[in-house]
Amino acid sequence: SCGKHIWIGGTRGTVIHSSDGGANFHVSNVPGADSLDFRDLAILDDKTVLLMSAGPAESGAAKVFRTENAGESWEMVYQTKEKGYFFDAILWEGKQGLILSDPAGPFYGLVRISNKGRDFSLLNPATHPELQKGEAAFAASGSSLQKTKLGYYIVTGGGSKARVLYGKDALNWESIYAEIPGGEGTGFFSLGVRDAKNLWMGGGNYSRIKEGPVPVLESLDAGKTWSPVVNAPAYYVEKILWADPYWILSGPAESSAFDPVKKRWISLGKSPYHNVCRVGDRLYGVGGRGQIGFISLSQIQQLFLSKE
């Protein structure tokens, strides 16, 4: 979301846009993208958006489309067909952006974006940790890659350990946390950022949505150390979001809110939401089959008050 603009990517080349803070939504399809799953996007300004498709590059599913007229027309601005590439997340920060891809070589694929989303260049990291067998990032909500003023973070799964990788810049990476068992389809799916020091992460296994094999963890020192969040719900988490003054968790089984002052949790219901964004006082959740829902922060406050 950006200002009153909400953008949602979907399957079969679908894109949904609201320009009035969620009062009305317009559904359209990107021409030539019928087979693509738009799993993440980057909003550069009111009119400029980059849509990222997730899928195997060798089958033509690793593409980026760009609009500079708020979706009236779209242009494909980047594609790779190299086997192994699978885009997981895209972010934009000021004047440049970054795409995270599953590994196609010795490390994750990282694509630098510049020139207002027109230019793309594949990075060649100078230093990076060795990959575990099967290790990858998950494209669930586009939040396996995050940026703070201290650098970049990637949260991973699929390998024997779910890890946190840190890069002061996008060219020099280290593994800073590898304590939680991973495995196929299992690991960290989302990293949430309150500020440069205070981070949360969570995940699970996408085939066991009502179980919590991966704990929700908090760091207060920019990712150097992590500890379990007390009484965190045990379900598969696809998105963690800081929506001041609450932490929000969402997944296909349930959503929850945590008040860090009172150290208390409440459930926000069982509706399946893969991703959540904040627009003003409202949180918008996006689920499968075109489902969009919202709840206001004031409603969440009332839910906490009613439980006291």
Model-based region annotation:
Residues S1-E308:
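Residue-level hotspots at or immediately adjacent to binding/recognition sites across diverse folds
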